[in-house]
């Protein structure tokens, strides 16, 4: 009897576990998987493939440009934002010797003169004096406060222009929002797509990580207006934000689309003529107290016709209009 009772208990536990597994599998396929796939990988963090844009590589996707300026001694280390890596990788190829780039097949070695740590880490590294030059969007309030706490002043040299964009699923019937509508979505005043002419579906307003270039741009866009926290709901239609080049060339996901703002598309022409309402500069950044004389040479090349052509041919808009 005791043995039969024990067997029944084991079978009951097994059935409960099996039901739990089946429930979770069904939930994943019906809800979670749909939530992830229906709106595309573009809403998730995605990094650029280092090797695809590696300098001194024959099949690299970078713009190959020559330079009369060659830096062979006291070479400044360069780092920066993921989305700008194709630009500063091209600068390294144009200006630096091949042996200055050290790559192990997965990542750059510590003593390589080019790194790709991303905006947040790159700002910390340049402020701490661990790298010489970074290419990024403007610093966040916290990054500026960190620099001030270290008694560091940063030099920000504008080198190009880029559109800050909002992205949704390609099947969302909304193609344009006003600036006020976007602000109302992110403050929680607008909570359903039907409030802006879309389907009767809750809006899931996503945010990026603190200190990233996109989050800093979003905080600047909101201009001090507090945003509600990102929704954790499984049901609804997502909206997110990033920079145009990152969405088009790095994420490159056919399941998402960029919204027009006030009826104006975020394309190259509208960025160049400042018709698109959310355009900002990106920068070459270094410490003002950095005494490396080669920084000025790099800046001169970056702002030259060839340096600005690299920006244009990569897919951005140059600040000097070349």
What are these regions (language model features)?
Residues 2-148, 152-162, 168-322:
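Exported/periplasmic ABC-transporter solute-binding proteins
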């Amino acid at each position: 009897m005791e043995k039969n009772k024990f067997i029944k208990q084991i079978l009951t536990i097994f059935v409960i576990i099996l039901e739990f597994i089946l429930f979770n599998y069904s939930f994943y396929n019906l809800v979670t998987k749909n939530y992830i796939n229906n709106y595309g990988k573009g809403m998730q963090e995605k990094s650029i493939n280092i090797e695809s844009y590696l300098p001194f590589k024959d099949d690299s996707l970078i713009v190959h440009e020559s330079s009369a300026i060659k830096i062979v001694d006291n070479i400044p280390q360069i780092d920066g934002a993921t989305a700008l890596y194709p630009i500063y990788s091209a600068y390294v190829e144009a200006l630096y010797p091949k042996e200055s780039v050290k790559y192990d097949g997965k990542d750059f070695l510590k003593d390589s003169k080019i790194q790709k740590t991303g905006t947040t880490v790159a700002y910390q590294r340049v402020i701490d004096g661990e790298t010489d030059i970074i290419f990024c969007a403007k610093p966040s309030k916290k990054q500026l406060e960190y620099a001030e706490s270290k008694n560091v002043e940063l030099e920000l040299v504008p080198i190009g222009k880029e559109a800050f964009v909002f992205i949704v699923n390609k099947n969302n019937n909304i193609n344009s929002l006003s600036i006020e509508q976007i602000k109302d979505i992110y403050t929680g005043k607008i909570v359903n797509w039907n409030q802006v002419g879309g389907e009767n579906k809750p809006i899931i307003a996503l945010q990026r990580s603190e200190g990233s270039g996109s989050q800093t741009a979003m905080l600047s866009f909101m201009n001090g207006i507090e945003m509600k926290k990102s929704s954790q709901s499984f049901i609804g239609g997502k909206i997110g934000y990033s920079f145009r080049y990152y969405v088009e060339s790095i994420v490159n996901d056919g399941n998402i689309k960029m919204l027009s703002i006030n009826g104006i598309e975020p394309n190259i022409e509208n960025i160049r003529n400042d018709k698109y309402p959310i355009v900002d500069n990106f920068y070459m950044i270094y410490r003002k107290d950095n005494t490396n004389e080669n920084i000025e040479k790099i800046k001169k090349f970056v702002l030259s016709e060839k340096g600005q052509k690299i920006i244009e041919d990569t897919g951005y808009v140059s600040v000097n209009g070349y």
